[in-house]
Amino acid sequence: MVTHVLAIDQGTTSSRAILFRADTSIAAIAQQEFPQHFPASGWVEHEPEDIWTSTVATCREAMNKAGVTPKDIAAIGITNQRETTVVWDRATGQAMHRAVVWQDRRTADICARLKAEGHEPAISAKTGLIVDPYFSGTKIAWILDSVPGARARASRGDLLFGTVDCYLLWRLTGGKVHATDATNASRTLLFDIHTGQWDEELLKILRVPRAMLPEVKDSSAHFGDSVADLFGAPISIRGIAGDQQAAVVGQACFAPGMIKSTYGTGCFALLNTGATPVASKNKLLTTIAYQLNGKRTYALEGSIFVAGSAVQWLRDGLGLIKQASETGPLADRSDATQSVYLVPAFVGMGAPYWNPNVRGALFGLTRNTGPAELAHAALESVCYQTFDLWAAMRADWPDAAAAHTVLRVDGGMTASDWTMQRLADLLDAPVDRPVIQETTALGAAYLAGLSAGVYPEPSKFADNWRLERRFKPAMSAATRTRKLKGWAAAVRGVLASDGGEGR
């Protein structure tokens, strides 16, 4: 009897597999970290083979833990770190270069050239994005220009490009299917989010051959079947979405005005704007939230590059903690008279500043500043950055008074009550943490299960969303104002170090 859906959650630092039952409860979870490579300042790479082997290993482990076989699994759903770029040989499957990760800033010069040549208005109008190293298009161009012979081979159709979902799908199907979904395509700088097609003008500007690009499908569709020797029998692959869009689905943010924020390596807030794309006046992105039955639902997005990775820095870079769960209790012991601010621009700054060149800084240090104050500043930096996104979304959304009065949160950092309470305090709004916090994986599972007939239509699925805890604002208005002013001053100081105020 088909009773489960398998979600592949391929993230920045680890690959995970989560088996969901038909009632969306979790049957098993498996996780495997893989190495990060930092060959130069601002460069971040992954070995595609590490992504692949860790994905297969976790799928097998989750199935073994739950005691299920392929005949028990209705479908596989894939969600993935977005923008991360893989280029591989169509015939052999060999990657031409390590995967260039979404955090990577090596293409800042390419982006500067595109802006200088006046291309940004056309790119932004069609893609809803800005010209920034974050997105896949300039990463593809860099690989083609940097690997000897790659550009000529790509023009002949010998090379394929894919975001991580596309690469995994190609491997899972034994090289039979080269496809992606609309959410991942919308993050490449090559896809017109209004027409739902790869755009010839954008391909020409970025110098990317059309032959490299995958077919673009709905987020819930039959993409193909896994080859039998991977799991013992074929399993249908029926759902794909980028990780942040999958979280929108998993959080059941199906109504315009609903907003979710996911806290993993980075932080990403998305506001559902319905069937109409809203052009941001406050340096947010306009993107596709999901595509079902050929109909696109759009979102405003704010992207923060450093959230959970600030806690990793406390652990791995400074040695202040041994595990992430220690951070909240440590921060709680900080000296309340100190005002230490961390601006964690380790790889530049994302929304709403968009400056790839600045680097992080600490402000307000005294002789008495210690581990507790640094932990406090690291956690609080995530809340301040979320506030910046929140304020920009309120300004952009045409009915701000009726929109996103509650923030739905998910991701690893939401386990910290300290951080979630501080987030509610600084936003001056309730923060809702759901019972099922694996919302990214749940979104992928839902998209796959919807196509397979396991899960109901979105409105009925939304009825199953359950609140675990609501964090209510408790900070005084005076304290909130003082702290936000201090954060704004710290950000100005960092931006001034590059001689500007962002893009």
Swiss-Prot record:
Keywords: ATP-binding, Glycerol metabolism, Kinase, Nucleotide-binding, Transferase. Glycerol binds at R82, E83, Y134, D243, Q244. It catalyses: glycerol + ATP = sn-glycerol 3-phosphate + ADP + H(+). ATP binds at T12, T13, S14, T265, G308, Q312, G412. SUPFAM superfamilies: Actin-like ATPase domain. Inhibited by fructose 1,6-bisphosphate (FBP). GO terms for molecular function: ATP binding; glycerol kinase activity. InterPro entries: ATPase_NBD, Carb_kinase_FGGY, Carb_kinase_FGGY_CS, FGGY_C, FGGY_N, Glycerol_kin. ADP binds at T12, R16, T265, G308, G412. GO terms for cellular component: cytosol. Pfam families: FGGY_C (PF02782), FGGY_N (PF00370). Sn-glycerol 3-phosphate binds at T12, R82, E83, Y134, D243. GO terms for biological process: glycerol catabolic process; glycerol metabolic process; glycerol-3-phosphate metabolic process. Pathway: Polyol metabolism; glycerol degradation via glycerol kinase pathway; sn-glycerol 3-phosphate from glycerol: step 1/1. Its EC number is 2.7.1.30. Belongs to the FGGY kinase family. Key enzyme in the regulation of glycerol uptake and metabolism. Catalyzes the phosphorylation of glycerol to yield sn-glycerol 3-phosphate. This is Glycerol kinase. It comes from Nitrobacter hamburgensis (strain DSM 10229 / NCIMB 13809 / X14). The lineage of its organism: Bacteria, Pseudomonadati, Pseudomonadota, Alphaproteobacteria, Hyphomicrobiales.
